[in-house]
């Protein structure tokens, strides 16, 4: 049940939780399968995938099937994280590249979920406007200058926190878990702690990998799958340990 490899790519194939570059997404998945085959000496044939709440799961499924994979398990992203962490009376906030997923978990079950069209892409847009640079340059710049860009992007995260507040109001939760690559921006955890002083706010050390790990874990527990991977294509640099 331990993760043994990860494949990540920087690519603009998903916007606001929707795969807009289908061919590009399929190409990335096939390339990752080639890399894993070289590493492990076998071609993986099955995969688990996920989708943002409120979107069509067939989008992710179609990408995997077009890449030659059989889909063994499908669930929404906040539910995957909630199952992995075995939460109770907690909220999950998954700030991804294009959307922010919010889920409420009671006694291990997701009782409420929603998805808002704001995420890392909107951070990049704000940074591009602030520095008068291209969107691509902003994407590159924000990865290595977190502390420096915080004053410029903080208002966007404040808006995200306000959105989360509306969704969790009256839900009676005690903990709030942050997930997703955009949560790794320095200052985000402290901002959420100030916004929600009555809650215990948790930010895992590697929140970037929280959702893919949760999806892989859910696929493993469903049985029958050979390979589980987060195949909702996102924008990360490929790295194989």
Give the positions of each predicted feature.
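Short beta-strand scaffold segments in enzyme catalytic cores
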Residues: 1, 100-104
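Nucleotide/phosphate-binding catalytic cleft detector across ATP-hydrolyzing
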Residues: 1-92, 109-241
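A generic beta-sheet turn/junction motif
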Residues: 95-97
């Amino acid at each position: 049940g331990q993760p043994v490899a990860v494949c990540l790519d920087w690519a603009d194939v998903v916007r606001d939780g929707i795969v807009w570059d289908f061919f590009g997404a399929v190409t990335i998945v096939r390339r990752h399968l080639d890399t894993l085959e070289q590493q492990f000496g076998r071609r993986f044939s099955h995969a688990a995938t996920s989708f943002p709440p409120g979107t069509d799961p067939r989008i992710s499924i179609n990408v995997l099937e077009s890449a030659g994979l059989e889909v063994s398990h499908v669930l929404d992203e906040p539910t995957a994280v909630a199952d992995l962490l075995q939460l109770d009376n907690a909220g999950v906030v998954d700030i991804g590249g294009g959307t922010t997923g919010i889920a409420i978990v009671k006694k291990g079950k997701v009782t409420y979920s929603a998805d808002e069209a704001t995420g890392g892409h909107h951070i990049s847009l704000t940074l591009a406007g602030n520095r008068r640079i291209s969107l691509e340059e902003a994407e590159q710049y924000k990865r290595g200058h977190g502390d420096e860009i915080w004053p410029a992007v903080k208002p966007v995260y404040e808006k995200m926190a306000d959105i989360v507040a509306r969704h969790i109001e009256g839900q009676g939760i005690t903990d709030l878990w942050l997930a997703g690559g955009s949560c790794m921006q320095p200052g985000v955890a402290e901002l959420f702690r100030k916004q929600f002083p009555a809650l215990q706010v948790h930010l895992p050390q590697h929140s970037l990998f929280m959702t893919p790990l949760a999806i892989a874990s859910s696929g493993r527990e469903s049985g029958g799958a050979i390979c589980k991977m987060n195949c909702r294509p996102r924008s990360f640099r490929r790295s194989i340990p």
